[in-house]
Amino acid sequence: MSDTERSLSADKKSDTELETPALSNVDPQERTRKHIEATAESDSDADLDPALGNGLPAHDDDEETGSRPVLDEATRKRQDLEARMDQILHKPKKKRTRRDEDDLEQMQDERILRLKDEMNIAAQKDIDTLNERLETGDTKLVAMEKVKLLPKVVKVLSKVNLADTILDNNLLQSVRIWLEPLPDGSLPAFEIQKSLFAALDNLPIKTEHLKESGLGRVVIFYSKSKRVEQKLARLADKLVAEWTRPIIGASDNYRDKRVLKLEFDVEKHRKKTILDTAKSKKKRSKRMEVDEEKYKSSYEQAAARRNRAAAPAQTTTDYKYAPISNIDAVNRNAGVGTSVDSSELYKRLNSKLSGNKHKRSK
């Protein structure tokens, strides 16, 4: 070994001896932390510089930014608008809570009760106006309060979603007051009658509602009164039939209708009619003849004076019983070999046809 090599090895040894005491004084945890930081720095340097680390090319942020498409202002606004629209459309719907339903029912009840009070006040004002007109004789006083309020009443009664609320709050009682005859004996305005009856026809009225409101008596009056227009009378009669059917337990199906039948003897009836006519002729008095003249129409009376026959007038008769048919039902499609062959009528027709054929052949 040369002198130069000995001097270099001595220098390295001295350097190592100088560094060793410095490392021995360092805390082990501090030494570990520095080692981790050094490793992280080396890894980051290797990523940034291809000369360091594994030799892979480093990622350039500028190149990635340049590869993305640059959006113009119109496209960006359109995308923002589409995103907001999707957010609105796919937004979950808020479910109606029980509290909201209770508040809605309470609002509907208050609305119907206010209308009920308004109807009662309007009816009372019209009654007061008519009483004042009867007392003073002033024909200028006209009861118009109900007519003014009628459009609002019809609007509420025609709402299907308020039908149960109307019936539960007994608005039918106010309807009955409006339909009742006035103090002077006249009926309400025709427009009131027509509108209210049309509304009643669409409401699901039950027996308990009729008992509570007392509406049934007024509707029966309209079905029997001669002062009511024929169309309204028929509608009132229809309502009475519909309301009465569940009370008596009748079905609305015509097939379920029971028809009372009774055997009818024509010969017996004819003999009885002859006997009754003979007895009535003997017992008839002049007073009865005078009474019959009263019930005759002017046309029949004029025909009787001229000793001429009068055309019979149309009468409406009701029958309690339907006659029992004594004709055997024969199938319309019946052919040869059925019960039709054995009937006397068929035999006579067949003999006549055969006789005609023999005559033609001769």
Swiss-Prot record:
Residues 1-105, 277-297 are annotated as: Disordered. GO terms for cellular component: nucleus. Residues 173-250 form the TFIIS N-terminal domain. Pfam families: Med26 (PF08711). It is found in: Nucleus. GO terms for biological process: poly(A)+ mRNA export from nucleus. InterPro entries: RNAPII_TF_IWS1 (IPR051037), TFIIS/LEDGF_dom_sf (IPR035441), TFIIS_N (IPR017923). PROSITE patterns: TFIIS_N. Residues 1-16, 28-38, 70-89, 287-297 have a biased composition (Basic and acidic residues). Transmembrane segments: none annotated. Keywords: Nucleus, Transcription, Transcription regulation. Belongs to the IWS1 family. Transcription factor involved in RNA polymerase II transcription regulation. May function in both SPT15/TBP post-recruitment and recruitment steps of transcription. This is Transcription factor IWS1. The lineage of its organism: Eukaryota, Fungi, Dikarya, Ascomycota, Saccharomycotina.
